[in-house]
Curated annotation (Swiss-Prot):
This is Na(+)/H(+) antiporter NhaA 3. InterPro entries: Na/H_antiporter_dom_sf, NhaA. One of its GO terms (biological process) is regulation of pH. It catalyses: Na(+)(in) + 2 H(+)(out) = Na(+)(out) + 2 H(+)(in). It is found in: Cell membrane. It comes from the Bacteria. Pfam families: Na_H_antiport_1 (PF06965). Its main location: membrane. PANTHER family: NA(+)_H(+) ANTIPORTER NHAA, SODIUM ION/PROTON ANTIPORTER NHAA-RELATED. One of its GO terms (molecular function) is sodium:proton antiporter activity. GO terms for cellular component: plasma membrane.
Amino acid sequence: MTAPRTPRKAFGRLSLPERTYLADALRTETVGGVLLLVAAIAALVWANIPALHDSYESVSHFHFGPAALGLNLSVAHWAADGLLAIFFFVAGIELKRELVAGDLKDPKAAALPVVAALCGMVVPAVVYTVTSTAGGGSLSGWAVPTATDIAFALAVLAVIGTSLPSALRAFLLTLAVVDDLFAILIIAVFFTETLNFAALGGAVVGLAVFWLLLRKGVRGWYVYVPLGLVIWALMYNSGVHATIAGVAMGLMLRCHRREGEDHSPGEHIEHLVRPLSAGLAVPLFALFSAGVAITGGALADVFTKPETLGVVLGLVVGKTLGIFGGTWLTSRFTRASLSDDLQWADVFAVATLAGIGFTVSLLIGELAFEDDAAMTSEVKAAVLTGSLIAAALATVLLKIRNAKYRGMVAEEERDDDLSGVPDIYEEDDPAYHLRVAAIYEKKAAEHRRIAEEMESARLAEVAGGAGDEGDGPA
């Protein structure tokens, strides 16, 4: 008789290597997210103080770069096309690692974040389309509310002091990685109007050389950085968005470990480049992209114009319903059950948190309304408003369960045997139980000694008291 299959757990315990990688990656992203938040606030202040507004516009639109190479760009343009290529390079490495060593390696495990991310992009696009069509607005911004900003989401978690269990954090990170993949495809397919095939061919040749050098084991930043810059410049001049070059190079790195390796080349390079991406590239992009004029009338327009209302509803309603619905449907069809410590309310809260769309949403907003400066600013204001509402809702929902999360995180990190490895990963190791037994035996012996000393002191005190009574008057 065949034994019944144990239902697969959704949001189950991560392996120790996955947990370690996740902790390192999210630590950097959290710091970067806080810097991103600071940069966004600085941009809004800079752009909205009358005495400083003109200087913000002057700096943002200041052009520099070699015109002969078609690279005489504004500061804001350099931030969007140049610095964000670093962000997408890291996204490419993350995606490659997830495909070869992470949740996306196993088709069954991959189904949950992939379907959730896909639904989390389709539903916001539908919400925007319906809202904009009903109000007679433009459909050009349908892709704006489809993106999730993992750094901003983690910054919110850091600010409100919530410690999500590692399984939910891993889901959020994997969701963001898949989300970035779809965003890359959207940018490449829908925002490429004209192609320069000579430049595109040159970029493809450059990528082939990049791949060949990696295959041959050639090392040295002085080889890859100049080559990467050439590939980026050719991709920019081809008409394809230049950030695609970063993704392509990231995907080419080897992310599986060979025997004797502590880290794969992809993991090593990601460890070096991620702080540059999270700490410099993305905050600078935010500084020169989030500086929109905020007035009472502008905020009112966000909720009255169909395009901007579509963006807000897409982020707040579409993202939440799409991700939550996709997760629930996938769990139903794959017969996966939630981890015992989690509830569907936790998944809903994380889905709400994923409604924070900032970096990529701002980028897509600039591309979608490139020829309409006024609408670009209004859509940016809508992205900021929608992200703020999503962050506020997520804060309330997560705070309700914060005590439970703290307990789960404490249990995940408990290390009674002081081995440096959390106990939950050693429960099947006899040596772990022997170490714990030795620790408790040592503690028991110490407590017995203390008890014996206290008892001896008490008996001595009693005996002394009896002697004093015998020496008294008859």
